[in-house]
UniProtKB/Swiss-Prot annotation:
Name of the protein: Stage V sporulation protein AE
Alphabetical keyword list: Sporulation
Source organism (scientific name): Bacillus subtilis (strain 168)
Highest taxon above the source species: Bacteria
Listed Pfam families: SpoVAE
Listed GO biological process terms: sporulation resulting in formation of a cellular spore
Amino acid sequence: MTTKRKVILVTDGDVYAAKTIEYAASKVGGRCISQSKGNPSTRSGAELVKLIASAPYDPVFVMFDDSGLQGEGPGEAALTYVATHPSIEVLGVIAVASKTHQAEWTRVDVSIDRNGEITEYGVDKVGEREFDDHRMSGDTVYCLDKLDLPLIVGIGDIGKMGRKDDISKGSPITMKAVEFILERSGYHAGPQGRENSGLSESS
């Protein structure tokens, strides 16, 4: 098959992020590479590409985490490999804010704040808007500006944000970021659009 796999990259891999991204993937009829979780990431880019290829459905969600390491850590090295692989089509990136202002930063096309509002400003770890236009700090985002990525959506700490994104509430901030990427990429117009999402819940 020459069809590229449709992938959403997520720059967070802790236990909260993993549970939330697995939930989001199920809601949109996709698959999450659960083995990509880790703080920091433990799977190489080559290993992740093989796991993506074996996933039964698109979109495929993959997590990357440098656990605060400066420069290009294992998560970013794997992200770069996956994002530039010829068998992968990146639909978008969910860029997750870090807890320190000394961390690396990336440009973002838009952010979604803790109240679910779309903004051109960056957000912090708890999802509050910051003052930087189209810019956000994070610890696994150093490589994003060097890559040719179609869409980068910034959000606060996945599954947290002062319980605003709690999975018991349906993780509304993460879900909005996912839906924004799917809509902007034109993915919903394809054969596995949102209308089919319920089919994968028990599979």
